[in-house]
Amino acid sequence: MTKKNASIPLRYLSSIVFVVFLPWWIPLSFNKSLESWVTNWWNTSQSETFLNDIQEKAILEKFIELEELFLLDEMIKEFPERRLEKLRIGLQKETIQLIKMHDEDHIHTIFHFSTNTICFVILSGYSILCNEELFILNSWVQEFLYNLSDTIKAFSILFVTDLCIGFHSPRGWELLIGYVYNDFGLAHNDNDIILSVLVSTFPVVLDTFFKYWLFSYLNRVSPSLVVIYHSMTE
């Protein structure tokens, strides 16, 4: 009985470790097998090269640069045959290199999307099958938060709100959204409209929900916490 009771916290602790580190375990576990399968599938089944707007723009800029060099050399006519042949070979090599580079980008995108999908499926299955463990973990967290003093709670709320919706938060959201972009293998630039919209609106939405929660829930549950929070903000 004692051994059984001692194994329960270890089981729940292992559940926490499993949930926290799963996003890193999945890419490491499927790195070689899944990446080789995606590479083989892409190389054998794709007859055309698909490019997004950013990739297409980069390739066009490179080709325009090479074409300008080609035309300039043709106009100068200095060592024409030899120079033109070198430029033709260089243009061909550059074309092959660009195609390989963008094929690797597409493989990278598919691989990351696949690993994230697998991670989501595993977490969904875990939340359904291990509902009891998650319920107990949730009760532990609630008990821990309940035992904290009102001052520590107010300080924690102030710290989290300043971090997420404070004056310097847009830069943090920009880095976080950029990380999500890279994690899914998506290309983005500094002028990305979606990134700008999310960075400008998401902190405002969070701030609105937080203020509503603060005055509707905390005012009813712990008025002293609200008083301490307002005193610290002032």
UniProtKB/Swiss-Prot annotation:
GO terms for biological process: potassium ion transport. It catalyses: K(+)(in) + H(+)(out) = K(+)(out) + H(+)(in). It is a multi-pass membrane protein. GO terms for cellular component: chloroplast inner membrane. It comes from the Eukaryota. One of its GO terms (molecular function) is antiporter activity. Pfam families: CemA (PF03040). The chain crosses the membrane at residues 8-28, 117-137, 157-177, 193-213. Keywords: Antiport, Chloroplast, Hydrogen ion transport, Ion transport, Membrane, Plastid, Plastid inner membrane, Potassium, Potassium transport, Transmembrane, Transmembrane helix, Transport. Contributes to K(+)/H(+) antiport activity by supporting proton efflux to control proton extrusion and homeostasis in chloroplasts in a light-dependent manner to modulate photosynthesis. Prevents excessive induction of non-photochemical quenching (NPQ) under continuous-light conditions. Indirectly promotes efficient inorganic carbon uptake into chloroplasts. This is Potassium/proton antiporter CemA. It comes from Citrus sinensis. The lineage of its organism: Eukaryota, Viridiplantae, Streptophyta, Embryophyta, Tracheophyta.
